[in-house]
Amino acid sequence: MSKFAKFIKFTEMLSDAEKELGIDHLSGLDKRILYFLEKASVAGNSMSFEELNNVMDTPRATLYRHGQTLVDRGLISKQKDPDDGRRNIISVTIPVRIS
């Protein structure tokens, strides 16, 4: 199988997975936000919007706008840090979609 054919197969698999999770309608930036939050979660870490902004090197206003849209859609949650009330902890909360 050629490298291009492998790429096409991978792209199709990724597209199917996005549809299954219900995130196929999201922008590239939204998917990157979810990626970094999930990566932090798997490592046992939490992230704030400020920390996410530092990692992603995205304009703050853009990141906050996309982040709030993801909160409104129920894909991420935002909660006050119990140790620092000024900090909001954000995490992935993608609901399971039952077909």
Where are the model-predicted features located?
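A short, conserved structural fragment
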Residues: 71-81
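Short alpha-helical segments that sit at the start of domains
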Residues: 4-36
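Short, hydrophobic-biased segments on the C-terminal half of alpha helices
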Residues: 67-68
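Short coil turns linking two alpha-helices in DNA-binding domains
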Residues: 59-60
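Short, cationic-aromatic polyanion-contact patches
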Residues: 25-29, 48, 81-99
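Short helix-to-turn junction characteristic of helix-turn-helix DNA-binding domains
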Residues: 37-41
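Short acidic, hydrophobic short linear motifs in intrinsically disordered regions
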Residues: 43-54
